[in-house]
């Protein structure tokens, strides 16, 4: 299960994620949180409390990077846990 909190500071949005980004429900929840931040210039995904990420989550990160680029928004990943960092590096 994934829980998401959003904090807006000026034109910066911090999306704090906690739990697991596993399965389509979690991936869609992440998509909704990020794509709702259309007024932000930068969106930071705080992954410090994410315990696991699987293929659907990785695919959603790719989608969100493209979405952000298309909307002139910078998407930044912040402080991923070791297991998430390993998955990101392995995925390339």
Question: Model regions: which residues?
Answer:
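Amphipathic alpha-helical interaction surfaces in cytosolic regulatory modules
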Residues: 21-92
């Amino acid at each position: 299960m994934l829980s998401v909190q959003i904090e807006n500071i000026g034109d910066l949005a911090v999306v704090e994620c906690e739990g697991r980004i596993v399965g389509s429900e979690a991936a869609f929840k992440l998509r909704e949180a990020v794509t709702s931040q259309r007024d932000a210039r930068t969106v930071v995904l705080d992954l410090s409390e994410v315990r696991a990420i699987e293929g659907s989550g990785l695919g959603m990160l790719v989608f969100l990077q493209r979405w952000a680029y298309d909307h002139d928004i910078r998407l930044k990943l912040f402080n991923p846990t070791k297991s998430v960092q390993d998955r990101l590096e392995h995925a390339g």
